[in-house]
Amino acid sequence: MIDFDGYRPNVGIVICNRKGQVLWAKRCGQNSWQFPQGGINDNESAEQAMYRELHEEVGLQPKDVRLLYVSKHWLRYKLPKRLLRYDSKPMCIGQKQRWFLLQLVGDEKNINMKTTKSPEFDGWRWVSFWYPVRQVVSFKRDVYRKVMKEFASVLFTDNPPIFSASREANSQSNSANKKYSQTKYTKRHFYKSKGQ
């Protein structure tokens, strides 16, 4: 499903642990790392797509995570010309993404990159909060900077908000910011993580 402007609707997923680190995934057969992400199918909400992608790409179930926040706006990036498929109709020029911030509440042993026949990732690790902004492929960097800045403003408060999973993605950004989590983060969790 591609919109009138040529962007494919997509969800992006940032999973944090209790130390304030984020899950960073290695694309299969490449030395390229990114957050889990995936397209939204027809007749599927952004939230439904997020949970489907969460399971397909990292093997986690809804019970393994707590939804903390949803980005207020759709964020877009354009694909480089070398990645465009000029023969496809309609042509996709990039992705427009709704981003979800999740906290891992289950066991990290449940993370499994091989839940499908064609996995997206073949490795993962925990990295410091801001590490992905500097390390992601250049054409995604602006989106990563915006989403991490938005998520940081949530996580750096004494009471980070959570989202009620029963609401649709459209209303998530409004309602998500009014609920609060029991986990309290401080700024130091995100600036220095061991090994980074």
From Swiss-Prot:
GO MF annotation: an example: mRNA 5'-diphosphatase activity
GO cellular component: cytoplasm
Pfam family, one: NUDIX
Motif (Nudix box): 38-59
E.C. number: 3.6.1.-
Keywords on record: Hydrolase
First-tier enzyme category under EC: hydrolase
Extent of Polar residues compositional bias: 167-184
Ranges of residues in domain Nudix hydrolase: 6-149
SUPFAM superfamilies from the UniProt entry: Nudix
HAMAP family named among the record's database cross-references: Nudix_RppH
Similarity remark: Belongs to the Nudix hydrolase family. RppH subfamily.
Designated name of the protein: RNA pyrophosphohydrolase
Record gene name: rppH
